[in-house]
């Protein structure tokens, strides 16, 4: 099968969605499929090469500058006049903002559509699949004049995404689905397609596709037995969705005497600077913030950790794929839950080295202190993890993807 995936890392160069798609593409390529990638990138952070796949690139440095100046339109942050002043420093960003906010015709959609039509004419793809979110690629594919089957892989929802207000909501998403042959969704999104639900009319087009997360952990030397004990988080922080406050509170309560170093890699700290400063004042060098790191660096950090930290989402219809990367590492997983119906809980119940703590739990710090002493140094063999979660093995995910598109 000749397949083209559209990957969008303009907003987030270390996007977990892009990583998931790259893993699926690699497995499909190894299975004998002809796989191409159209990478929409920010002009500053190229994606790593994927052996065997043919890569085509479109750079959108203008939209990167626009997003940085306008702070991605998030509430709070800098006053609007300050954002506009920053925007005016970059003529290409001003043009990008005009196209997006006034003309409602983002260059990313228009240029991607033209590139899709050109590539389809040249390579005669059987399937073109846009990986979402972001959804710019999906909207480009929606009206592209191509012969290939059109599909999207919704690793994050559109209308039901509670992190932002999606333009057009459910009617716009249904319109998009009407132009597609198939849509792959997460298990958490199934309810949107149930009888009487907003997207029920498209139910026959959607198929659940699990995260292709279980890859062997990075081969790294273990740190010395007398070196610091590490609890590691790798991921982005978002106000109202995934916040670090509960984790920082717990490790401040453990204090320096615990001997544990909390390392939290990833972006979003500008929204939580005060909490981070308070934690740094208590823990000093035992609180590390290396910032965003490439996927391979994150895998190395996870392989060298003693415990992996997962921050539960504040919504019940999105599940961070990084949880399954943690499982693949085989390390003990500390999950901090902030809602009762956390979609991660059923998976954590299947993982024998997991501890779940709930926000507001009075004895959480004491429980954590005891658990850290019990699990430090433990690790599940990779094969055992695959037996626990066979649906997350990339080859199984690839087989499902192909089965629904044949």
Where are these regions (language model features)?
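N-terminal subdomain of nucleotide-sugar transferases
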Residues: 1-65, 182, 214, 252-254
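Membrane-proximal helix-turn-helix segments that form the acceptor-binding/catalytic region
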Residues: 23, 107, 117, 136, ...
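Short N-terminal targeting/anchoring amphipathic segment
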Residues: 116-137, 151
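Conserved donor-binding/catalytic core segment of Leloir-type glycosyltransferases
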Residues: 223-242
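Nucleotide-activated donor-binding/catalytic signature segment of Leloir-type glycosyltransferases, i.e.
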Residues: 266, 273-297
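Catalytic binding pocket for nucleotide-activated donors in carbohydrate/polymer assembly enzymes
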Residues: 303, 307-389
């Amino acid at each position: 099968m000749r397949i083209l995936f559209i990957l969008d890392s303009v907003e987030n160069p270390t996007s977990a969605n892009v990583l998931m798609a790259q893993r699926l593409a690699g497995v499909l390529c190894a299975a004998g499929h002809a796989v191409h990638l159209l990478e929409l990138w920010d002009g500053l952070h190229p994606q790593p090469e994927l052996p065997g796949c043919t890569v085509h690139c479109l750079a959108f440095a203008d939209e990167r500058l626009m997003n940085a100046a306008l702070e991605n339109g998030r509430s709070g942050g800098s006053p609007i006049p300050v954002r506009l002043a920053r925007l005016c420093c970059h003529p290409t960003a001003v043009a990008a903002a005009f196209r997006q906010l006034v003309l409602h015709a983002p260059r990313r959609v228009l240029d991607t559509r033209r590139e899709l039509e050109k590539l389809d004419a040249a390579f005669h793809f059987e399937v073109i699949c846009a990986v979402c979110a972001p959804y710019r690629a999906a909207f480009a594919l929606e009206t592209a004049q191509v012969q290939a089957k059109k599909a999207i892989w919704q690793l994050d929802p559109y209308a039901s995404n509670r992190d932002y207000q999606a333009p057009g909501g459910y009617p716009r998403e249904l319109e998009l689905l009407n132009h597609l042959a198939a849509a792959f969704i997460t298990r958490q999104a199934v309810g949107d397609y149930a009888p009487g639900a907003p997207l029920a009319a498209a139910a026959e087009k959607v198929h659940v596709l699990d995260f292709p997360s279980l890859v062997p952990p990075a081969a790294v030397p273990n740190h010395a037995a007398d070196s610091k004990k590490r609890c590691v988080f790798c991921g982005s922080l978002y106000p109202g969705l995934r916040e670090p406050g509960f984790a920082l509170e717990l490790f401040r309560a453990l204090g320096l005497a615990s001997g544990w170093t909390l390392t939290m890699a990833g972006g979003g700290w500008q929204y939580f600077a005060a909490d981070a400063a308070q934690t740094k004042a208590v823990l000093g060098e035992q609180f590390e913030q290396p910032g965003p790191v490439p996927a391979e660096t994150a895998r190395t950090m996870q392989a060298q950790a003693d415990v992996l930290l997962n921050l539960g989402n504040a919504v019940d219809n999105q599940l961070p794929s990084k949880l399954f990367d943690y499982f693949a590492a085989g390390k003990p997983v500390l999950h901090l839950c902030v809602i009762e119906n956390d979609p991660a809980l059923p998976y954590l119940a299947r993982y024998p080295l997991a501890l779940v703590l709930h926000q507001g739990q009075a004895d959480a710090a004491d429980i954590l202190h005891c658990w850290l002493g019990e699990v430090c140094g433990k690790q599940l063999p990779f094969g055992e993890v695959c037996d626990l979660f066979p649906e997350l093995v990339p080859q199984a995910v690839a087989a499902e993807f192909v089965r629904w598109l044949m």
